[in-house]
């Protein structure tokens, strides 16, 4: 998309603990322009409702977006609810189970999506939320030049914990400073974040071992 639309910007947004900064670096290695890490103890224990609230709040802070792309579902809860809930909270159209973006026009997008028994081609207005199916083509590989450019990119927390001996590097090269946001930074409501904002409660966990 970025190559086909000169002047466009790709922004990475992820929510998680400090180590989730690795996801942002990986995106930068593959051609993204910038990234934001949504991290705060107050986000811990979030179900899909609280997760989608936090992400939608951060997206509003980032500003105008034409296309918001996310995975279909996480590998733990496996519910596929966060993407649609983000779309609902932002008041945007959504296309789920996307396999390929066929065309992006001035005010609409054409997408091929996976359905039971085949595929279908659909159109949607911009801005839009798209969740990508596992059958989509793999993302672009790492770019060696970008790996060299961003390999020292760090969040404030990482720099504080790392006892780095090249801190002046971050003053000279602002693109190496990864942004991390707390609940307060995105003007979030604590009552809607983490366990406080999660109506889903885990009653029990059982390990199942297949013989």
Q: What do the predicted segments below correspond to?
A:
Residues 1-211:
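N-terminal glycine-rich FAD/FM-binding segment characteristic of electron-transfer flavoproteins
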């Amino acid at each position: 998309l970025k190559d086909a639309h000169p002047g466009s910007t790709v922004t990475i947004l992820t929510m998680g603990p400090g180590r989730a900064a690795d996801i942002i670096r990986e995106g930068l290695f593959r051609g993204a322009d910038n990234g934001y890490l949504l991290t705060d103890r107050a986000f811990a224990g979030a179900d899909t409702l609280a997760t989608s609230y936090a992400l939608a709040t951060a997206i509003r802070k980032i500003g105008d977006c034409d296309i918001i792309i996310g995975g279909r579902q996480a590998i733990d809860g496996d519910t596929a609810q966060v993407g649609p809930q983000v779309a609902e909270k932002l008041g945007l159209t959504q296309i789920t189970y996307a396999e390929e973006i066929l065309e992006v026009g001035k005010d609409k997008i054409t997408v091929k999506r996976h359905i039971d028994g085949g595929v279908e081609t659909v159109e949607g207005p911009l801005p839009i939320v798209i969740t990508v199916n596992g059958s989509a083509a793999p993302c672009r590989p790492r770019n060696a030049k970008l790996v060299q450019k961003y390999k020292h990119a760090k969040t404030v927390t990482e720099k504080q914990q790392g006892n780095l001996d090249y801190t002046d590097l971050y003053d000279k090269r602002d693109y190496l400073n990864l942004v991390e946001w707390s609940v307060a930074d995105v003007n979030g409501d604590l009552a809607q974040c983490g366990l406080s904002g999660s109506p889903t409660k885990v009653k029990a966990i059982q390990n199942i071992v297949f013989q």
